Amino acid sequence: MKYNIVLKFEVEGIVDKPDVIGAIFGQTENLFGEEFDLRELQDKGRLGRIYVNINTSKNKTEGEIIIPSNLDRIETALIAAMVENVDKVGPYNARFKLVEIQDIREEKIKKIIDRAKEILGTWTKEKTLDIKEVIYEISSAVKTGEIIEYGPDRLPAGPDVDKDPELIIVEGRADVINLLRYGYKNVIAIEGATGKIPQTIIDLAKQKKTVIAFLDGDHGGDLILKELLANNVKIDYVARAPTGKEVEELTGKEINKSLANMMTVAQYMKKQQEAQQALKEALAPESQPPIVVSKPTTPEQIKEITIKIPQHIIEEIKKLPGTLEGIMFDENWNPIERIQVRDIVQRLENLTDNQNISYIIFDGVITQRLLDLASAKNIKLLVGARIGGISKRPKNVEILTMTDLFTS
């Protein structure tokens, strides 16, 4: 059925349902010919069964009639008007009034839409794609699915460590996992070797065309390289993580850059020896003449800076490279404080006038912010590992790199 014709009625007497239905059929018969005879329409399935609800009180009968219709809109409206025209039920006067014509299809559509919303809500809640979960699942698959235990020493390694002609040696399991995450499957860890490198590493390296030692950018990385070389492991190239960083925390971009900048063992050792030699030659004993560094401040003027470094200070400076630390001195080169490089700016911000700091030597970058703070706090000299982008140099602060200091 398409529609429900809903009517209210009132009869001025006590009647039953058959009386009401009989009045409807009797008073609408042949009004518009057999084509719109209600019984004929019911027989053809064009109208449904007539439902009557009755309430009687005080010699009156009231109620509601529902007539299901499968006719079109115009024909359904005509049937409603015909029933409204009924004015007697039995011997009693009666009034029939149309309440509404319900579109059953609209109700069905509304129910379908509401149900669809309910289904979608449940489905969305259960099936929503969470990118973090996807990444975690993929990462977990890399960790558990690709990492293997290689050789008699059961060392953490990538799945291609045996068949790839190139081998990357790292320190620990976490380093292997990180390289696997970025697609490097020819990697193996020595797993924290101290003094003795596993025989598995020595034997595997001999079979490879190229062997790369990829190590942390700290003192620990230096020690691992020494152990590898001391145990006669075949190493062709050395790659290092950025200073102060570990291989396990590098991004894919940082890994690519570190490997692109790798050096042969000979080149690497030569560079290290040159740096050590420069340090030894530059840091002379107390009896040597004062170090004189000339730096041009303008094209027309060269200002000479004379710095005399006591022997005990020289010994301290020798230990700074690679520590990411700094030392603050007073005007007489008495050490006031040893500090992490990352804390120097905050320390200067909190510096009071009665704290007599004149010189700062540190294993870090001299930045514009640090230079401005040093000027405001009347620091006379900053010596860093290198100088960053400086656009303005205060007149009351001199800046040098350790290279300047060592090669003067």
Curated annotation (Swiss-Prot):
Q: Which GO terms describe its biological process?
A: DNA replication, synthesis of primer
Recite the UniProt keywords alphabetically. Answer: DNA replication, DNA-directed RNA polymerase, Exosome, Magnesium, Metal-binding, Nucleotidyltransferase, Primosome, Transcription, Transferase
Q: What is its EC number?
A: 2.7.7.101
Toprim domain sequence ranges: 165-243
For whether the record's keyword set contains Transcription, the answer is yes
Cofactor descriptive note: Binds two Mg(2+) per subunit.
A Gene Ontology cellular component where this protein is annotated is: DNA-directed RNA polymerase complex
> What family is reported?
Belongs to the archaeal DnaG primase family.
Query: Briefly, what is this protein's role?
Result: RNA polymerase that catalyzes the synthesis of short RNA molecules used as primers for DNA polymerase during DNA replication. Also part of the exosome, which is a complex involved in RNA degradation. Acts as a poly(A)-binding protein that enhances the interaction between heteromeric, adenine-rich transcripts and the exosome.
- What is the official name of this protein in its record? DNA primase DnaG
